[in-house]
Structure formats: structure tokens, C-alpha cells
């Protein structure tokens, strides 16, 4: 069905009823839904052989929303961009899991000369201004603090901050969206 890739970008109350009851509830946010919807539709076109049209949608996303998120990137369900995703750059081969939030001015890509790109797990929060690069993996349920530089793999269930990053909390059981609901 053509609308199913776009349905992944719809507000939480729609997703919750139609896809899975375990997704965090979100209100409709006009600031982040259009860039993600453009990505989803472009990704659908890319997977079905309409690569030029998909690339055009990526450029529209870049021009109107300042988000570089190529249609060839693999991004899971309930992906969120913070503050329109302004200045966000995501490499075309990156794999991002479900229920991730990428804040503004984040770069996710490869290191100069390296061929590998990051693989990001489920329930990951990447704070504003962070840089995640190289052939690394970010485990599930990780919080990356603002302005952090991550160039080595990060285990699951932890919080990392700094440049170079350091782990400040391990064995964290709450996901980022559960912590957000407590604040």
C-alpha cells in the first residue's frame, strides 16, 4: 500500500492504533512531520526503483527543511527530528532503529577515508550538535548528550557525553521517551 510508508510519520495516536500499542504517545508536530514524511515517501520510491524521484525528494527536504536525509538511508519506525531537524545530516547508508530521536545540528556519517557508517539501535536519543561517525554501532536504549563526538561503538543501555565521549551511566533501564514523560 502506498500510504504505509507515510503512516510511519503520522502522529503517535494514529500509529498506536494501527501499528503497535507499544509506541510512545506523541502529539502531532507540524515541525517534524513534513521532513520525515518526505523521507518516508522518498524511501518507498527508492526501494521500488524510482531513484531519481527519490533523490529529488531528498533535495526538496534539504531546501525547505535544512535536513539532509537521503532516501537510501534505512530508518526505523517512529523516527523523530527535533526542532525541524535543522542542520541535520544523515549519511545515505546509515541504519537507524525504531523510536529514535535525532535533535537539530546532528551529523551521522562516515569518517574521512573510512567506508563504514554507524548502525544505530532502537530507542536512541542523539542530542543537539552531536557527531556520530565511523564504522561503529550504537546499542539499543542509548542517550547521547548534546555536542558529543562519538567515534567508537557504544554498548546498550547507557548514557554518553563529551568530546571525546565517556559513559556516565550504565545499565539504564528507562528509554529516552519514558524519561521525557517524567520531566
Residue ranges and their predicted role:
Residues 1-67, 165, 171-183:
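Terminal amphipathic alpha-helical/low-complexity segments used for targeting or macromolecular assembly
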Residues 64, 85, 115:
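Short coil/loop residues immediately preceding or within conserved phosphate-binding loops
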Amino acid at each position: 500500500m502506498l500510504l504505509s510508508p507515510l503512516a510511519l510519520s503520522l502522529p503517535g495516536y494514529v500509529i498506536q492504533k494501527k501499528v503497535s500499542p507499544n509506541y510512545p504517545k506523541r502529539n502531532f508536530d507540524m515541525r517534524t512531520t513534513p521532513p520525515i514524511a518526505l523521507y518516508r515517501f522518498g524511501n518507498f520510491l527508492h526501494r521500488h526503483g524510482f531513484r531519481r524521484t527519490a533523490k529529488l525528494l531528498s533535495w526538496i527536504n534539504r531546501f525547505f527543511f535544512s535536513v539532509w536525509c537521503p532516501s537510501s538511508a534505512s530508518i526505523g519506525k517512529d523516527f523523530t527530528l527535533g526542532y525541524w531537524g535543522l542542520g541535520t545530516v544523515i549519511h545515505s547508508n546509515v541504519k537507524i532503529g525504531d523510536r529514535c530521536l535525532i535533535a537539530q545540528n546532528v551529523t551521522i556519517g562516515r569518517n574521512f577515508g573510512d567506508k563504514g557508517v554507524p548502525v544505530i539501535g532502537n530507542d536512541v536519543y542523539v542530542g543537539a550538535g552531536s557527531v556520530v561517525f565511523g564504522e561503529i554501532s550504537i546499542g539499543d536504549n542509548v542517550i547521547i548528550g548534546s555536542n558529543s563526538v562519538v567515534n567508537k561503538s557504544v554498548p546498550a543501555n547507557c548514557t554518553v557525553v563529551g568530546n571525546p565521549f565517556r559513559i556516565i551511566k550504565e545499565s539504564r533501564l528507562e528509554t529516552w521517551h519514558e524519561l521525557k514523560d517524567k520531566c
